[in-house]
Structure formats: C-alpha cells, structure tokens
Amino acid sequence: MADLENKTVKANVENKPGAAKTQSVSAPKRTESGAKKQIWEKRSAHDSKDMPKKSVDRANKVKNRTRFGEANNEFSEKVVNISRVTKVVKGGRRFSFSAFVVVGDKKGKVGFGHGKANEVPDAIKKAVKDARNHLISVPIQNKITVPHEIHAKFLASKVMLKPAPKGKGIVASGTVRAVVELAGYTDIYTKTYGSRSKANIVRATLKALQQLRTPEQIAEIRDKDVKDLLG
C-alpha cells in the first residue's frame, strides 16, 4: 500500500504542467501491526485469562448463597414478643414496632434476636437476621435433655433447667419453651423466678444453656475419667 501511494504522488507531480522538479515525499507509513497490537492489548484486558477467574468467583458466590439458603431453611423461628414503641421527637411522636425472635435448628443450635421497624413484618425480618447472627451451640444429653441441673440469672429474671426422663416432655412456660424446643430438647424441667420480662427470661435461658457442660468436658476439666464421674 505504501509503494502505490508513493507512485501516485510522483505521477501527479510529473503530469502537472510547469511543475518544478521536486523530490517525492512519501506518505507516512501506517503501522498496521502496531494498530493491531493496540487492539489486541485492549482485548487482552478482557481475554480468557481473566474471565474464567471472574466466572469461577461468581459461581462460588452463587454456591455459597445456595448453601447459606439451604442452611437457613433448616432453622425454625418463633416470635417471643411484639410491642409498639414510641419515640418523642421535635415534630411529635414516631411510632414503630419492636420484635423479639428465637431461631434454632433443633439440633443443638439456637439464637435470639431483636428487630425494630415501622411495620411488623420488617421488624420480624430484622429480628430473625439478628438471631441467626448470634447462634450458640448447646449440649444435648442422650438427644433429649440437658446433661445436668443449671441455674442462671439475667438482671431480675432467674431460670432453672433440670434433666427429665424420656417421655416427660417439656415442662416450661411459653417463653422458655420456645428456646429449649428450638434448641432440640424434648424432655426437660424448667422454672422461672423474679421478673417476667420475656426478653430477660430468654436471655437468662440462653445464659443457662451456655453454662452447660457434657460429661466429657467436665472430666477433662477435673482431669478424670468419664467412668469415674458417672460412677
């Protein structure tokens, strides 16, 4: 292409009448390879080397979301209390709703959450999300009851948990029942003392469950054999 352009420039100069003889000026050469290289470099930023990594990352995120969704489907939830709250501001009063929710998988994991919103469903959703972010693991003796008797206190609320024989069922008030049932206990004695605040009773129950120890854990703490503890 460059040679043809040089010849045409020479022919035009020679054909003009009275034109002085001048040196032919060649047109600037096009660096087609350079242009192609630039295009290739631009494409290389989005070539197949980077795309698989992004696609793999996206696929992993989708898998993790799916697994998280499947894990969340295993959890059950119970609304402990819903109350209407008021906030006094300069323009007057603002009303909203407060919700307390307990979630658990009935396999040894349970959590308690609080949510506040202008509508009841939104408050419950926030409470469920908060509860799932504050899950605890609790021991279940023989898959039915607590390993031993335990007492716990939160502010003015007190709770007692005691093992029960198989077939006895859950002997508890509605607030404590929601916690122990979602935790996975099927036979247990409970008793509440002091303040009847539902939120405080739930927190006292969770505090008691956190203090539970399996025979293996107690034997390890005392540096003894499990058989010696159980007699």
Curated annotation (Swiss-Prot):
Domain notes: The N-terminal domain interacts with the head of the 30S subunit; the C-terminal domain interacts with the body and contacts protein S4. The interaction surface between S4 and S5 is involved in control of translational fidelity.
InterPro entries found in the cross-reference section: Ribosomal_Su5_D2-typ_SF (IPR020568), Ribosomal_uS5 (IPR000851), Ribosomal_uS5_bac-type (IPR005712), Ribosomal_uS5_C (IPR005324), Ribosomal_uS5_N (IPR013810), Ribosomal_uS5_N_CS (IPR018192), Ribsml_uS5_D2-typ_fold_subgr (IPR014721)
GO cellular component annotations of the record: small ribosomal subunit
Keywords assigned by UniProt, alphabetized: Ribonucleoprotein, Ribosomal protein, RNA-binding, rRNA-binding
Biased composition (Basic and acidic residues): 29-60
SUPFAM superfamilies the UniProt entry points to: dsRNA-binding domain-like (SSF54768), Ribosomal protein S5 domain 2-like (SSF54211)
Record domain S5 DRBM: where: 75-138
Function field: With S4 and S12 plays an important role in translational accuracy.
UniProt family annotation: Belongs to the universal ribosomal protein uS5 family.
Protein's name in the database: Small ribosomal subunit protein uS5
